[in-house]
């Protein structure tokens, strides 16, 4: 549909379909399951086909990491064994994560700005938490995460304005709930 143009809209549809399929699995009729699986397959294939041999060759493709990659990862693992391509997506997402993220450095900073850091915080917690859980390896042991706690504090200390690095971030007068929640989640993962 022309009304669902754009990757953020498609990723929202993929997320909703995956959440409904996974969360209501025992309540869905076979036709409802198939409808959701068809939607997951169509959007998942679209993302995968655009990422493979592209994403791994680009040093910065910021919109992918904000949400579409995370959502494809969750869709892949939720449908392994249900959609033939899902195991390929899962393998790709896992290997892409371990080869590229969380950062392209060890200092813990998000060099393209704090606003962009903020739109990535769900991915930066949810994907490594998921991979840590299924693999038994602590993905938060990466040097980037160890130093990221300092970045979160130094970029915007408690009760202060933001350092202003990033689109519109100079207007952040106090750390918002997302930043505080991220810091809390990071602290619990780094224990």
Per-segment meaning from a language model:
Residues 147-191:
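Acidic/histidine-rich catalytic neighborhood
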